[in-house]
């Protein structure tokens, strides 16, 4: 498994609506349920209509396209980091998984996973 560091800082947000979200930004993950509208984006791209936000996240992605039949990649990462008391925030796309970690634990997490 190869991981690729993402150099930008991320924010996890709750937004009123998506009207001010820049969907052309390099990273923009949105999630909508019956209870909330969420956005994860580069901190400098956070729109002004946020209700709540949590800054200070760094991330990496599992490099390459992950076939849906692959089992256990994300659980292995989560297990290794949990054993070292590092919490994660995960976003999955069609191709791969993105793992966000608070800045203060980011380098430690990378060192552990190498």
Task: Report residues per predicted region.
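Regulatory modules associated with amino-acid/nitrogen control
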Residues: 1-80, 84, 108-114
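A generic structural motif
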Residues: 36-41, 96-102
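C-terminal structural segments of small proteins and small subunits
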Residues: 87-94, 101
